Design a protein with these regions (language model features):
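Electrostatic cytochrome c docking/interface patches
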Residues: 21-52, 150-155
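Short, conserved sequence motifs enriched in acidic/basic residues, glycine, and aromatics
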Residues: 40, 90, 118-119
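Sequence/structural segment immediately N-terminal to covalent heme-attachment motifs in c-type
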Residues: 41-66, 73, 96-98, 155
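Gly/Gly-Pro-rich "capping" loops immediately C-terminal to redox-active cysteine motifs
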Residues: 64-97
Length: 155
């Protein structure tokens, strides 16, 4: 529980404007300049999101959403990062939701379980809120603007 409390504290700090950017992380601003969007996440949603993430997602995606080190290796079934350093931000919101609900497979083999029978729509939204709070501001801004416009984020 102490680790979850620490993760919640980090998420709250990120929400309050103290975002982190890992060296070498992909940057949406390289694709096109965008002005920042509001990053006001509900504290309750963040708390629920981190709790649910730790229960259902952390085993594969890592306790801090960092993903498996071999996530880019096509020879390895490894969960990608959800902290903004992977490709999740390049997906439309409805695509992220569909993957969480229905799972994912590669060459017909399941690589992520379907959570539609265990997680409600609100649970999924809270989990996404938590990991999106970890995204660098430029990436989150790009994702929000592209989703509002109906475009697939590029980068």
């Amino acid at each position: 529980m102490n680790r979850i409390g620490g993760v919640v504290a980090v998420a709250v700090l990120l929400v309050s404007g103290c975002g982190k950017k890992e060296p070498g992380a992909p940057s949406a601003k390289d694709a096109a300049p965008v002005s920042q969007v509001d990053r006001s996440f509900s504290t309750e949603s963040l708390i629920r999101g981190v709790r649910l993430y730790q229960e259902y997602c952390a085993q594969c995606h890592g306790p801090e959403a960092q993903g498996h080190p071999d996530w880019q290796n096509p020879q390895v079934v490894a969960a990608p990062p959800l902290d903004g350093s992977g490709n999740a931000w390049k997906r439309k919101k409805q695509d992220l939701i569909a993957v969480i609900k229905n799972g994912a497979s590669r060459q017909g083999e399941p690589v992520m379980p379907a959570w539609k029978d265990r997680l409600s729509d609100q649970d999924i939204d809270d989990i996404m809120t938590w990991f999106q709070a970890l995204w660098p501001s430029d990436i989150y801004t790009r994702w929000r603007k592209d989703n509002a416009a109906g475009a697939t984020p590029k980068g």
